[in-house]
A protein has these predicted regions:
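Solvent-exposed interaction patches of small proteins and small membrane subunits
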Residues: 1-126
Length: 126
């Protein structure tokens, strides 16, 4: 992401990645996921995207992030760093658990934050 976006842009990236993770894991169980390098790579990549977008919000819209503590911005970025910089030691069981438990819990929080961001960035005309 080369150009700084508004918070809504980063949140939209996060939602797209969340949706992709849901599609890539749908119909799979953990055993099938462990056998599919393509699914593993796709999920890992989208976790990285979520984490990078979270970092960009912390950097470019810190006040917004501070108002939305329901989203674990730093934890998301930390997971991205572990995956990106420790690719040879990625624990796929943790990736699976994150994809099927944590990511679905994150989705409504990001959706709500996006609604707020859009209202703040585009206030209604009076």
């Amino acid at each position: 992401m080369s150009k700084a976006l508004r918070a809504s842009g980063y949140l939209d990236y996060m939602l797209q990645a969340i949706d992709r993770i849901g599609r890539y894991t749908a119909g799979h169980d953990e055993a099938a996921f462990m056998q599919s390098e393509m699914a593993q790579d796709a999920v890992v990549r989208n976790i990285e995207i979520i984490g990078e977008a979270a970092h960009d919000i912390l950097k470019d819209a810190p006040a917004f992030a501070a108002r939305h503590t329901e989203i674990p911005w730093k934890i998301l970025y930390g997971m991205r760093n572990k995956i990106s910089h420790g690719y040879h030691v990625v624990d796929l069981a943790v990736v699976w658990q994150t994809a099927v438990e944590s990511v679905p819990e994150l989705a409504p929080k990001v959706q709500n934050a996006l609604k707020v961001a859009l209202l703040e960035e585009n206030p209604p005309q009076r």
